[in-house]
Design a protein with these regions (language model features):
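Sec-dependent bacterial lipoprotein signal peptides
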Residues: 1-25
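His/Met- and acidic-residue-enriched segments that coordinate or traffic transition-metal cofactors
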Residues: 3-4, 25-183
Length: 183
């Protein structure tokens, strides 16, 4: 009996495999429906002339702040001003890098030096040391903050490029924190 069983298994096993394979070929799959067209990608927010002007204004302010903050680390009379200067230099350099990315994307050129009038004010502050430097630096920072504050607020309210608006918000909060720390 075992011989007969083995014989049947040898005959029927390949037969079952062939029949099941042929059965799978007999079924014709219906044609797949066509994929719908891809939706149009959302266009990036427009980069307006106001955005470009803001990026350039913030760039010149950042350059001046970085130059004076680096001076504050060595010339400040108070240690808190020196530490704050190091923080401002690091943070504004990061903002500068973000502005450079935005400028590259939108083919905008940024200056690498502050305006000549700002350079004179920076040189005037940098000539001092100790407590005199602290007073001049705090006064300069307060006046620069007063000048840039409405520009930042306007950009946050009316800016069209979300990256530029995010930079404006970030700088707005950082400058307010620095101003509070200097008092």
């Amino acid at each position: 009996m075992s011989f007969v069983f083995r014989y049947r298994a040898r005959v029927f096993s390949p037969l079952l495999v062939v029949l099941s394979a042929l059965g799978g070929c007999a079924y014709v799959t219906p044609e797949q429906p066509r994929a719908p067209a891809l939706p149009v990608l959302a266009k990036p927010a427009p980069f307006t002339a106001a955005d470009a002007e803001f990026v350039q204004t913030l760039n010149t302010m950042d350059l001046a702040q970085i130059a004076l903050a680096k001076s504050a680390t060595t010339q400040a009379g108070r240690s808190d001003i020196a530490l704050l200067g190091a923080t401002i230099a690091k943070d504004m350099a990061a903002v500068q890098a973000r502005l450079a990315k935005v400028a590259t994307v939108h083919t905008l050129s940024l200056t690498d030096k502050p305006a000549p009038a700002e350079q004179k004010r920076i040189a005037w502050v940098q000539r001092a040391h100790g407590a005199v430097f602290d007073r001049r630096y705090i006064r300069y920072f307060a006046s620069a903050y007063a000048r840039i504050k409405p520009v930042l607020a306007r950009q946050v309210a009316t800016g069209t490029d979300p990256t530029v608006v995010a930079i404006a918000r970030d700088v707005q909060t950082r400058l307010a924190d620095y101003q509070a720390a200097m008092r």
